[in-house]
A protein has these predicted regions:
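Short loop/turn segments immediately following the C-termini of beta-strands
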Residues: 38, 77, 129-131, 180, ...
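Short, solvent-exposed loop/turn segments at conserved positions within beta-propeller repeat blades
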Residues: 38-39, 133-141, 180-183
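Hydrophobic alpha-helical segments and helix pairs
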Residues: 90-156
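A short beta-strand motif characteristic of beta-propeller blades
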Residues: 12-17, 50-56, 99-106, 151-157, ...
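Short loop/turn segments immediately following beta-strands, especially the blade-tip
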Residues: 85-92, 188-195, 276-281
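A short loop-to-beta-strand structural motif that recurs across blades of beta-propeller domains
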Residues: 42-44, 79, 141-144, 184-186, ...
Length: 292
């Protein structure tokens, strides 16, 4: 990537950046874009100019969150781990292996972590998927909340074949989630302190394709990466906008930039720059790793 990529980012056109990269878990933090590449077991950062920096990891990372202490929480298959971010960022990741924090569903070897992020209170909320996924696969995936204060708590949500699209309303009281093997996005009432969910209900049903990653903007609208398109939904579930994309295998949309008004969509073929239509994102809550 070079200066041309930076100009394209400012222009807000649907253009692929780093087309050879598998961009998963895309998010904005500390004035940089960050993502993981599950295929190469690496974490990347990019300041929207020049080449991205890369740190190889012992295992593939499917989700991650930044911590209040400056560390990063990594989701690696069956484990949540902590890793240090040295100065400059990523310098320390390759030198010391991540430190395991908690095993996830160790009695069920058929699952692995598939998606996750922090809720508005700084807890890490994530889901699992069947490790060997096929269309209409077995629904053995679950949803969890992790914090240092309470440890790992399972959320009382329906099992899924592949958990995706985990995100939260601006006030943190509604959780959105989806099963990538189904054509629907669901929502529920969410109590972060008690790790309690209630009133699970349909948010949106897809006519075609499958829902993957999602994010919520400052106006409470949900942006969903689906099979070859990005869809924006109103808080009541009405589809407001649908933009086709050249990549079928989309991963996650994210807002970034100094004003959180730049919209990128990760995919198995790089990042796609989109016109957000004036929408702005919300900053990710930092994982609270200082509570005991």
């Amino acid at each position: 990537m070079d200066g041309t990529a930076r100009q394209d980012l400012a222009a807000g056109v649907a253009k692929a950046i780093a087309p050879d990269a598998h961009v998963a878990g895309l998010r904005w933090h500390a004035d940089r874009w960050w993502w993981s590449d599950p295929d190469s077991a690496a974490l990347y950062l990019w300041n929207a100019a020049g080449a991205p920096l890369r740190s190889r990891l012992p295992d593939s990372v499917t989700a991650f969150a930044f911590c209040q202490s400056g560390r990063v929480l990594l989701a690696q298959a069956k484990w949540l781990c902590f890793a240090d971010l040295a100065a400059p960022p990523l310098e320390g990741l390759g030198r010391r292996p991540p430190q395991p924090a908690v095993a996830v569903d160790p009695a069920e070897p058929r699952t692995a972590i598939s998606d996750g992020g922090t809720d508005r209170a700084g807890n890490f909320v994530f889901g699992t998927a069947a490790a060997s996924r096929t269309p209409g696969g077995t629904a053995i995936g679950s949803f969890y909340q992790y914090s240092l204060r309470h440890g790992l708590r399972r959320l009382a949500l329906p099992t899924v074949a592949a958990a995706h699209g985990i995100c939260f309303s601006p006030d943190g009281r509604i959780m959105y989630f989806s099963d990538a093997s189904a054509r629907r996005i669901q929502q529920c009432d969410y109590d972060a302190g008690a790790a309690r969910v209630a009133n699970v209900r349909l948010f949106a049903e897809l006519a075609e394709g499958q829902p993957r990653g999602a994010t919520v903007d400052s106006g409470g609208c949900l942006w969903s990466a689906q099979s070859g398109r990005l869809v924006r939904y109103a808080p009541d579930g009405a589809a407001l906008r649908s933009e086709p994309l050249p990549s079928v295998h989309l991963t996650r949309p994210a807002f970034g930039g100094p004003g959180l008004d730049q919209l990128l969509v990760g995919s198995a073929g790089g990042m796609h720059v989109m016109d957000g239509g004036g929408a702005r994102g919300l900053p990710d809550a930092l994982f609270d790793d200082r509570k005991t």
